[in-house]
Amino acid sequence: MYPAKYQVVPSGINYSDTPVGTFEQYQPQKAGESSEHFFSKVVVALIVILFAVGIVYLAYTLFLKDLILLLKAKKQKTTTEIGFGNTPLRRPGEGNPNGGPV
């Protein structure tokens, strides 16, 4: 008979019946060490950050712009030049009704 071209069973040098690793190596990971637990923390952190950014954006668009405008007006001690919404235009010949600088 011809010699086998491929060896189906490994040779005795590379093969042994006893496992190489110890029993502790094959124990499953604890729940706190899994990558799924870490991923869930990342997802929760991203949701909290997006929620906080959304609240800040809504607060700015709804009332913080008006509050900043009001504080600037109080700092200037006059609210005549500050317009809310559509304000009528001045005609060039009218000038300042108070007589002071603009």
Curated annotation (Swiss-Prot):
Its main location: host cell. Keywords: Host membrane, Membrane, Transmembrane, Transmembrane helix, Transport, Viral movement protein. InterPro entries: Gemini_mov. Residues 82-102 are annotated as: Disordered. One of its GO terms (biological process) is transport of virus in host, cell to cell. Pfam families: Gemini_mov. It comes from the Viruses. It is a single-pass membrane protein. GO terms for cellular component: host cell membrane; membrane. The chain crosses the membrane at residues 43-63. It is found in: Host membrane. Involved in the viral transport within, and between cells. Belongs to the mastrevirus movement protein family. Interacts with the capsid protein (CP). Part of a MP-CP-viral DNA complex. This is Movement protein. It comes from Tobacco yellow dwarf virus (strain Australia) (TYDV).
